[in-house]
Every structure is written in structure tokens, then in C-alpha cells.
């Protein structure tokens, strides 16, 4: 028995010796010249990462044997399991391969390579989940997002100075929109796994009071989509009408309770198509993962709406008209600052409109658009009788056109200025009937507001006790007047076909410009697996 005890003690001592030796070798490995050379070689194309390691005496983030390194690597591998949750390109990070390489590394050279590999994947993942997978302008030049990308050094320094949990928890967008979109994504994935919404739809327009099998088809479709409780009635009753109206409201349709082609078209969208919209919206949220401003304006182009928020609360909203879905007239996406308001504005007709639209018409009829003044290079008004329009073409026409202030001015009585390279602004319009339409894409790119006066009052509230009086006084002059905002207001022209409204309810809109379809295809090319998983592409609608 004593012999066995001796053998046991010797074995224990040897075991502890080998553990100590292994740890010593590991420590020596990460402090060796070989480790540094391997790390530097693997990071040779990332000068910022090299600078970080040099500043920290090449102390490893991942492969050290201290507890902090173990916590970082363990939490990072855990975090990579959530890539599909956020609709990120899972295979791009290849967590299984990373983990295998991490576990197999023994020599200084191997540890240096793994340290560099984990750092590279960490930086890629962090950037992707925080500020997006794609570069917006590479998908569509009209998406002009100035994304506040973080530097490599900032990522590495922050990650090294806080707990992994704290770092990763705050990485993805913290907005209400992003959180709700993740919930909707999960819901849609469950629906798809159960076979989707496949259901036969009616072939004819249905109204309240109608009776028959077509009504049953409509009812069943709305039951499957969660708008009605199970019911087998063949009558288009009040409950069905309210369900149709609710569906219409949440899909940007006139809530008239009549099920026609537009309503059937939206009901007919598959769960896969809706999921594609959500995936794109998640990427778009990552592009705008910055402070929108305590007081800011959101112009959602597919929703044809303009909203003013203050401290997270909606304080004003109005319908709008956006650019037509043709080249050079689509409204771009960007962020800026509303600096001032101009009442009784003069409309200086953009040169492209003058040459492409008005010049041909004036060549046929010199009095066409006679409400527009001809302006020469000296900014003097020239009588039309002095000009032979047929002497010129697009390249030689020397005049500009402008419309003087009036209630019939194309800009109405007020415009809201955020000076930008696209000459885009918000403005009034004399064409009020357009706001009654569902699809309101009729402008040359600028945004027309249904309630511009009320919008002006809200913008002026922080700087005057009587904003209405101040604004109306400027209007009453009949002359072009500039009213500056003492505190400029951020304005964001966004494009969301899937979003959450102020009640926390998911809404969907048509892809009026086809931008989401292009983004979805680009995401597929970047490696997200939605196409293979869900089998459908996002269709352009409009």
C-alpha cells in the first residue's frame, strides 16, 4: 500500500512539473522573437494593428495564458455563434476553423499566426456588426451614407480595456428599430420553417357585405398572417373589414377596407420576401448606427413620410412626395442639418430640367411655361420675344429659368434648407391632390410636404414663444425671406421598407426605387446565407 502511495505522489509531482513546464513554454512562446515575427508577418497589411501591438510590447490579446486572454477568446467564439441571428456572413468568420487553429497552436510561430488570425477576424466581425457588411455607395451611388467607421486601434484598445461582455454587448445598433427587426426576423424564420404562408388568394375585388368562397380565401390569408382569429364565415363582415384596414395601414395602403389588387399584391408577398426586407433593414440600421440627434427629422422615402422627433418621441409627422423612380430624379439617401427656412422662395429651375424638359417645349411654343422668367449670364431678366429658342440646343442654351415668389410657385410658400451637393431640400407645393395618393413619387428629387407650415412652426418652437406669428410675419412680406434656426436640426433621408412604427408594430413598404433588391443581392454575394436558406430573392416593387 505504501508503494502505491509513493507512486501516486511521484506521479502527482511529475504531472505538476509538466503543467509548469507547459505554461513556461507558452509564456516563453508568446514573448519570443519567433512569436513577434510570425505576428508581424501575418499582420503585414494592417499597419494600425501592428502599431497597437508595438505600443503594447506585443502582449497577446488571445493566446496568452492569463485569464483575460482566455476570457476574450472564449467570449469571441461564443459571440461568433450569433452571426446568423444578425444576418451576418457566418462563413466569413468561420468560427469552427478559428477554434481548431486556436486549440492546435503550440509553437511560437503557430501562436503568432493564430493571434493575428483572431485579431483580423475580430476586427472584421466588429466592423460588420457595428457599421455594416457593405459599402453603401458601392451598391447604389444614390446611397450617400457617411458611416462613422471606427479605427482598428480604437477597436483593439477598447476591447483590451473592458470586459468582453461589455464590449460585444454595445457593438451592434442599440436602436429600438434594430431590436424589433431581430424579433421579426426570428418570427419569420419560424414561419418559414413551418411551411410559410402559402395560401390561395381571391381573384376579384372584395367589399364589406360580399359573400362567398372568395371571402373565405381572403379571411384565411389574413388569419395565417396574424390579422384575424380563426373563423369560417363566408361573409365580409365588420371584423374582416377591420382586419383588412389594419393590414392596409401596416403596408402603406389606403385603409378603405376594400380588398383590391394593391391589397392582394401585398398579402401575396411570401414570408421569404418579408424576411429579405428585414435582413436589408438590419444592414441599413448598421449604416446609421450613430446619434441621430436629440431633435431630428426622419424622411423615410418608401413610407412617403416626414417625421420630427424630440428626445425619442414623435412630435410631428406629415405626408410627403419624393422623386420619381427614374434616373437622376430618385431622391438620394444622406444625412445633413436643416440650417434655415426660406419663405416666399424663388424657384431657380435646375439646369437639367431647363434643358431636358422646358427647352424642347419652348422650341415648339415660345410661350410655353410663360410663368418662368428667362435669366441671362448677368442675372438680368430677358423678354421671351428677344429669344429664338430654336437657335439653341442643350449644349448652347445660355439662359436660366426662374419662377418668382407666388402661391403658384413650384416650391409653394416655404422651403427648408440643408445645403448639400444634390440641391435637395424640403418644400411646400401647390399640387396638394398628390398627397391623397398611395404612391407619391412625382418630384425631380426634392421632398414636398403636405403640412409645411405646421412643420415650420415645430422647427421654430425652441427659439420663439410664438412660432406661428414669426413664420406668418415672414410670409406676409411677400418677399423672399430667410429665417435661421438658432439650433440647426439634423435631417436624415432614409429608406426603410421594413420598420417599426411608434406603437412598436412592424410595417412593410414597397421597394419603390429597387434599392433594397440591389442591397439584398449584394448581401448574398457577401456571404449571408439567406438565399440558400430561404430560396427567394427580394423583388423590386413599386
Model feature map: region roles:
Residues 29-147:
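Cationic-aromatic interfacial patches
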Residues 160-161:
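Post-signal-peptide, soluble extracytosolic/periplasmic N-terminal scaffold domains
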Residues 14-22:
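Bacterial N-terminal signal peptides
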Residues 3-14:
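Bacterial N-terminal signal peptides that target proteins for export
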Residues 6, 25-54, 123, 143, ...:
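Well-ordered beta-sheet/strand-loop patches within structured domains
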Amino acid at each position: 500500500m505504501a508503494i502505491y502511495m509513493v507512486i501516486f505522489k511521484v506521479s502527482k509531482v511529475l504531472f505538476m512539473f509538466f503543467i509548469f513546464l507547459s505554461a513556461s513554454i507558452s509564456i516563453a512562446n508568446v514573448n519570443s522573437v519567433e512569436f513577434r515575427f510570425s505576428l508581424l508577418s501575418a499582420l503585414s497589411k494592417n499597419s494600425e494593428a501592428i502599431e497597437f501591438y508595438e505600443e503594447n510590447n506585443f502582449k497577446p490579446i488571445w493566446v496568452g495564458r492569463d485569464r483575460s486572454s482566455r476570457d476574450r477568446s472564449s467570449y469571441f467564439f461564443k459571440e461568433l455563434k450569433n452571426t446568423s441571428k444578425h444576418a451576418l456572413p457566418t462563413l466569413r468568420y468561420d468560427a469552427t476553423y478559428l477554434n481548431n487553429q486556436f486549440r492546435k497552436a503550440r509553437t511560437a510561430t503557430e501562436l503568432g499566426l493564430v493571434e493575428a488570425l483572431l485579431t483580423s477576424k475580430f476586427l472584421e466581425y466588429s466592423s460588420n456588426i457595428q457599421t455594416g457588411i457593405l459599402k453603401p455607395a458601392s451598391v447604389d451611388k444614390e446611397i450617400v451614407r457617411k458611416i462613422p467607421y471606427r479605427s482598428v486601434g480604437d477597436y483593439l484598445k477598447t476591447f483590451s480595456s473592458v470586459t468582453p461582455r461589455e464590449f460585444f454587448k454595445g457593438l451592434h445598433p442599440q436602436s429600438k428599430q434594430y431590436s424589433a427587426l431581430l424579433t421579426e426576423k426570428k418570427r419569420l424564420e419560424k414561419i418559414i420553417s413551418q411551411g410559410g404562408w402559402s395560401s390561395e388568394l381571391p381573384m376579384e375585388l372584395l367589399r364589406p357585405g360580399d359573400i362567398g368562397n372568395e371571402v373565405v380565401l381572403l379571411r384565411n390569408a389574413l388569419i395565417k398572417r396574424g390579422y384575424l382569429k380563426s373563423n369560417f364565415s363566408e361573409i365580409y363582415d365588420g371584423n374582416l373589414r377591420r382586419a383588412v384596414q389594419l393590414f392596409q395601414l401596416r403596408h402603406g395602403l389606403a385603409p378603405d377596407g376594400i380588398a383590391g389588387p394593391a391589397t392582394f399584391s401585398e398579402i401575396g408577398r411570401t414570408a421569404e420576401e418579408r424576411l429579405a426586407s428585414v435582413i436589408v433593414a438590419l444592414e441599413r440600421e448598421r449604416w446609421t448606427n450613430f446619434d441621430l440627434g436629440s431633435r431630428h427629422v426622419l424622411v423615410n422615402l418608401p413610407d412617403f413620410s416626414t417625421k420630427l422627433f424630440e428626445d425619442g418621441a414623435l412630435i410631428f409627422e406629415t405626408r410627403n412626395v419624393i422623386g420619381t423612380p427614374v434616373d437622376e430624379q430618385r431622391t438620394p439617401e444622406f444625412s445633413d442639418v436643416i440650417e434655415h427656412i426660406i419663405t416666399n422662395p424663388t424657384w431657380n429651375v435646375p439646369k437639367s430640367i431647363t434643358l431636358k424638359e422646358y427647352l424642347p417645349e419652348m422650341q415648339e411654343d415660345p410661350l410655353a411655361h410663360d410663368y418662368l422668367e428667362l435669366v441671362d449670364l448677368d442675372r438680368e431678366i430677358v423678354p421671351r420675344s428677344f429669344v429664338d429658342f430654336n437657335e439653341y440646343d442643350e449644349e448652347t442654351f445660355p439662359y436660366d429659368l426662374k419662377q418668382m415668389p407666388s402661391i403658384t410657385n413650384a416650391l409653394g410658400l416655404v422651403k427648408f434648407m440643408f445645403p448639400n451637393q444634390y440641391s435637395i431640400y424640403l418644400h411646400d407645393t401647390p399640387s396638394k391632390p398628390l398627397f391623397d395618393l398611395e404612391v407619391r413619387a412625382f418630384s425631380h428629387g426634392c421632398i414636398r410636404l403636405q403640412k409645411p407650415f405646421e412643420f415650420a412652426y415645430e422647427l421654430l418652437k425652441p427659439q420663439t414663444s410664438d412660432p406661428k406669428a414669426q413664420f406668418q410675419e415672414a410670409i406676409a412680406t411677400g418677399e423672399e425671406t430667410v429665417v435661421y434656426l438658432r439650433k440647426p436640426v439634423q435631417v436624415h433621408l432614409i429608406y426603410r421598407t421594413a420598420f417599426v412604427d411608434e406603437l412598436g408594430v412592424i410595417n412593410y413598404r414597397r421597394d419603390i426605387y429597387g434599392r433594397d433588391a440591389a442591397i439584398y443581392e449584394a448581401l448574398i454575394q457577401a456571404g449571408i446565407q439567406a438565399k440558400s436558406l430561404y430560396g427567394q430573392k427580394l423583388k423590386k416593387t413599386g
